[in-house]
């Protein structure tokens, strides 16, 4: 009896970061062909919002932006896959080829399982956090119980996280170490404009509203921080209206240092 061959499905993950699978790579390839996120979304069968969110997640996940949207990109303008994006596409293709070879070993009766294991791996776990931001540690201040970790996100944007001293030590946090900062969207407060005034939240990221999605009760706001980085907040619909939040409006994301979770690549 002829059996259907097994198909290799590759996905890449880093600690605490969302999974990047073949569907996201296909989206990047489609953007490269069409030059727009809207055209790519139609080709791969995604809604425009889903495709836009996927691009934002990818840009936040990697050190260099994978896609650059020209002015007006949110409403159908041009988009360009960067050299880093092209390198990811090419590298993913090479890994898929290696995975297919390893799969052939498995189908052949696992006569050399160690060979397959050298080709199959996972770069770790999933996360449900809406915001996963790649950062570099700039300073660590250790206390008796807690540690304050300062992080560089982009030029002009920095974060502060407060974690346990034990966690900071076990993770080997020191200046120059790369980490992922995870912040739940519901933990992010928003203030209209660039100066929120006196407030206890030490993390303040000012940007421009890139997208607003309204639900019956809550509203999702995506704030463009520049350099292809973004942060998402979920606030009440009433609050979004009161603040006058709409695409193109400046706003500031606010959140506590204790609400930042750190994960290692």
Curated annotation (Swiss-Prot):
Pfam families: HTH_1, TOBE. GO terms for biological process: molybdate ion transport. GO terms for molecular function: DNA-binding transcription factor activity; identical protein binding; molybdenum ion binding. Keywords: Molybdenum, Repeat, Transport. InterPro entries: Mo/tungstate-bd_C_term_dom, ModE, ModE-bd_N, Molybdate_resp_trans_reg, Mop_domain, Transp-assoc_OB_typ1, Tscrpt_reg_HTH_LysR, WH-like_DNA-bd_sf. It comes from the Bacteria. Gene3D superfamilies: 2.40.50.100, Winged helix-like DNA-binding domain superfamily/Winged helix DNA-binding domain. Belongs to the ModE family. NCBIfam families: ModE_repress, Mop. This is Molybdenum-pterin-binding protein MopA. It comes from Rhodobacter capsulatus (Rhodopseudomonas capsulata). The gene is mopA.
């Amino acid at each position: 009896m002829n059996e259907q061959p097994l198909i290799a499905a590759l996905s890449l993950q880093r600690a605490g970061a969302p999974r990047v699978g073949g569907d996201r790579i296909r989206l990047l390839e489609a953007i490269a062909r069409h030059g727009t996120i809207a055209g790519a979304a139609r080709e791969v069968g995604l809604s425009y919002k889903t495709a836009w969110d996927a691009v934002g997640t990818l840009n936040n996940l990697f050190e260099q932006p994978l896609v650059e949207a020209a002015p007006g990109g949110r409403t159908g303008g041009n988009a360009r896959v960067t050299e880093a994006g092209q390198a990811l596409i090419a590298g993913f293709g090479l890994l898929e080829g290696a995975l297919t070879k390893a799969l052939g070993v498995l189908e052949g009766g696992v006569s050399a399982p160690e060979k397959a294991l050298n080709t199959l791996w996972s770069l770790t776990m999933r996360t449900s956090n809406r915001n996963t931001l790649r950062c570099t540690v700039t300073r660590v201040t250790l206390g008796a119980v807690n540690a304050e970790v300062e992080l560089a996100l982009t030029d002009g944007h920095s974060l502060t996280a407060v974690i346990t001293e034990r966690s900071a030590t076990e993770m080997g946090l020191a200046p120059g170490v790369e980490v992922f900062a995870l912040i739940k969207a519901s933990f992010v407060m928003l203030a209209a404009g660039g100066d929120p005034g006196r407030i206890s939240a030490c993390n303040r990221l000012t940007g421009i509203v890139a997208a607003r999605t309204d639900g019956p009760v809550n509203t999702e706001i995506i704030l463009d921080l520049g350099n292809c980085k973004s942060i998402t907040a979920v606030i009440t619909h009433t609050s979004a209206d009161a603040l006058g939040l709409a695409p193109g409006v400046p706003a500031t994301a606010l959140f506590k240092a204790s609400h930042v979770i750190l994960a290692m690549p």
